[in-house]
A protein has these predicted regions:
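Flexible coil/turn and secondary-structure edge motifs
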Residues: 1-179
């Protein structure tokens, strides 16, 4: 990796943001993770509006990362391991466009990397990858009670049965990339 002085931003949507956030909080080189919304038409959307499926927004995480420690490509490899990029507008029992698989890019380089990783990952999956690659739009941070949700509610039903297995898969598969 080339030496760069500033952090970079990655914005990823792979279903419920509680899952994605919990994984990336443990990734070495990721310095900040926030849950939020992007990709729709509503301004200042609320969780209830996004879950209602009328805003067009996806649940996403905004990652700040040090490219000297973890490459954008590595973040995407994690992303494609912790969710199913072949199911359109759903992850498990979470159904709707707000749960779509999407990569919002912040530069032409990120877009090229995302498309390359998708092409490579296509060989891993039996079904076609439906992940969207779109330019980043206005970011809306989710309500405070969604931030660091898994750490605050590890025994809550959804966290125990959906989030925890994804975190365990990350820990097993990417132990060399953990903090």
């Amino acid at each position: 990796m080339s030496q760069q002085s500033a952090t970079e931003v990655a914005i990823l949507g792979g279903g419920c943001f509680w899952c994605t956030e919990a994984v990336y909080l443990e990734a070495r080189g990721v310095t900040r993770v926030e849950s939020g919304y992007m990709g729709g038409s509503a301004t200042e959307p609320t969780y209830e509006q996004v879950c209602g499926g009328t805003t067009g927004h996806a649940e996403v995480v905004r990652l700040e990362f040090d490219p000297n420690v973890i490459a954008y490509r590595d973040l995407l490899e994690i992303f494609f391991t912790i969710h199913d990029p072949t199911t359109l507008n759903r992850q498990g029992n979470d159904v709707g466009t707000q749960y779509r698989s999407v990569i919002f890019t912040t530069s032409p380089e990120q877009e090229a990397t995302a498309r390359q990783v998708i092409a490579e990952m296509a060989a891993v999956w039996d079904a076609p990858i439906v992940t969207q690659v779109l330019p980043a739009e206005t970011w809306y941070k989710a309500e405070d009670y969604h931030q660091n949700y898994f750490a605050q509610h590890p025994l809550q039903g959804y966290c125990a049965f959906v989030v925890a297995p994804k975190v365990a898969k990350f820990r097993k598969t990417f132990s060399d990339r953990m903090k």
